[in-house]
Amino acid sequence: MANQSTETNQPSNMQTYGVPIYAADWIPEVDVRSKIIMDPEKSEDDDESSSSSSSSRSCIVLSGGGGEGRSGISNVILICRVDLNTNSLSEQPLGRLVVGSDLPYRMAVHPREGGLICALPNSCKLFHWEDIMSREDNQAGESEEVIKELRDVGQQLALAFNPEGSVLAAGAEDGTLRVFKWPSMNTLLNESQAHSSVKCLTFSESGQFLVSLGGPVCRVWDVNASAAVASLSKEKDEMFASCRFSVDSAGNEVLYIAANTERGGSIITCDTKLWKRKWSKPIKKNSISAFNVSADGKLLAIGTLEGDVLILESTRMQTIQVVKKAHLGLVTALTFSPDSRGLVSVSFDSRARLTMIEQKGDKPGVRWWLLVLLIVLLYVVAYYYMKAKGIIP
């Protein structure tokens, strides 16, 4: 069981940060080490790279708030500490930046040292880690940059960097898909009718392909050719919810699509050579609101409208861990730690929750069945042995 927070009755792996949370991601370790001061009293010389010290430096960034109006709830970007060794989140954010009346609804963290891009109601803005950490008045200022090419473009519902951080994609509520080189912002693609509304974006591990999802269609784009090369359509009553690229155990790229139906959710696995669906795994009685894949490709995470969190093994799609009522409301985002040991989930309930991945092992029921089978086999062998020796007729 997780340790209890010192000031509340909730476990230390679940913290309440005072605002509805819409997005979450892990901050690259190089940024944590160089730009986010974790422990001012600790000497910089004491920088031995061990698994323990690396875990203690882990940080996540969260964004959310009350939006426009007079709700009294601030719109903020938060930096919080995560300790995988003790299964805990910091009670108070390490950094907190108020961004005025604009809700940071979606975000993309640069995979190297490029900071954070947030999608605000009408524009996208670049934030630097040191500004989130060091601003004395906790208010966004002129150092936060509105990205010129994404100014006055309406609400962006999806943002994504390619794995190298050299390409940025933005998907708009009006269905426009924009792809740029980063950081030059030279346009690679500007498709005004990619979808009725772009809901999700994901780059392939190689960076060659970008998948955009919106409504009943999932489109595949060749980034280098700046053109669509395939489309995947829904079947029957499916409604696509999210998508993620990953790599399977054989080193092949695979595309996962999370969908909802009247019977519940499902995870669709797609071949990335023929761009055809291979199979679909129903997730009965669970409507999917958030989806992600671990960095090592071995695990899938699902957040539901009911606030549950499910973790699946990716090869056979077996559910290996369930956290019922992880949140009081629908799960808005999920993000695995870079080493795939932990999962952070967030929600409208203002909470962030850290779930440690249980180590593989035989379940007690399986061990009992193996023991029973062994006893039966020993009995059969003993019976025929004694019969052969004439001990029993």
Curated annotation (Swiss-Prot):
Q: Where are the transmembrane segments?
A: 368-388
Entry keyword set: Acetylation, Endoplasmic reticulum, ER-Golgi transport, Golgi apparatus, Membrane, Phosphoprotein, Protein transport, Repeat, Signal-anchor, Transmembrane, Transmembrane helix, Transport, WD repeat
Region of interest: Disordered: 41-67
One of the entry's Gene Ontology molecular-function terms is: guanyl-nucleotide exchange factor activity
- State the WD repeat positions: 151-190, 193-231, 283-322, 326-367
Q: Report the domain of life of the source organism.
A: Eukaryota
Q: What's the short name of a Pfam family annotated to this entry?
A: WD40
* A GO BP entry: protein transport
> Modified residue Phosphoserine is at which positions?
43
Residue ranges that the UniProt entry lists as topological domain Cytoplasmic? 2-367
Q: Kindly list the places in or outside the cell where this protein is found, as annotated in its UniProt entry.
A: Endoplasmic reticulum membrane; Golgi apparatus, cis-Golgi network membrane
Those parts of the protein on the Lumenal side are 389-393
Give the modified residues of type N-acetylalanine. 2
Spell out the subunit comment: Interacts with BZIP28.
- PANTHER family, per database record: PROLACTIN REGULATORY ELEMENT BINDING PROTEIN (PTHR23284), PROLACTIN REGULATORY ELEMENT-BINDING PROTEIN (PTHR23284:SF0)
State the function annotated in the UniProt record. Required for the formation or budding of transport vesicles from the ER.
Q: What else is known?
A: In the process of transport, may migrate to the Golgi apparatus and function in subsequent transport events.
Q: What is this protein called?
A: SEC12-like protein 2
Q: Gene that codes for this?
A: STL2P
